[in-house]
Structures are given as structure tokens and as C-alpha cells.
Swiss-Prot record:
This is Small ribosomal subunit protein uS17. Disulfide bonds: none annotated. Keywords: Ribonucleoprotein, Ribosomal protein, RNA-binding, rRNA-binding. Signal peptide: none annotated. GO terms for cellular component: cytosolic small ribosomal subunit.
């Protein structure tokens, strides 16, 4: 069975070897017929502490690493410096 891969934005990197990633999904509301945005936060393993707040990353489902971490960061893009 293939592992799920999600794309999101890092919203916290304060924990050692862990990032919190916000994944957004969009759907059409069945009654209102308008696009609705919903997001969910996932704790993901970041072995090298490479990703910072604002970076776009892809996370992959993984075996449980801790109580909250079931995802690992597989790749990403650094946020552009201004």
C-alpha cells in the first residue's frame, strides 16, 4: 500500500528534530456551493533540523516515531529571503 504524501507549510520549528506542518485542503460546500478552506496540523520528523517557519515541505506517512509523530519530512523548498 503506498504511503500518503502531503504538502504543507512549516508553522513551528521550536522542538528538536520536529516541525509542525499546516496542511490545507479545499472543497466545495454542498449547500452553499462555495469553496471552503480547512487546515490540519501534523507533527513531522526533521532529523537535521533543516526546515524553518514558512518553508514549504512534503511529508510522508511513516511508522510511529513518538506519541504525536507519524510523519517524516521528505523534501521541501526554502522560503525566499526578503
Amino acid at each position: 500500500m503506498p504511503k500518503r504524501v502531503l504538502q504543507g507549510v512549516v508553522v513551528s520549528d521550536k522542538t528538536d528534530k520536529t516541525v509542525v506542518v499546516r496542511v490545507e485542503r479545499r472543497f466545495t460546500h454542498p449547500l452553499l456551493k462555495k469553496t471552503v478552506r480547512r487546515s490540519k496540523k501534523y507533527h513531522a520528523h526533521d532529523e537535521a533540523n533543516a526546515w524553518k517557519v514558512g518553508d514549504t515541505v512534503w511529508i510522508e506517512e511513516h511508522r510511529p516515531i513518538s506519541k504525536l509523530k507519524n510523519w517524516i519530512v521528505i523534501q521541501g523548498e526554502k522560503r525566499a529571503e526578503v
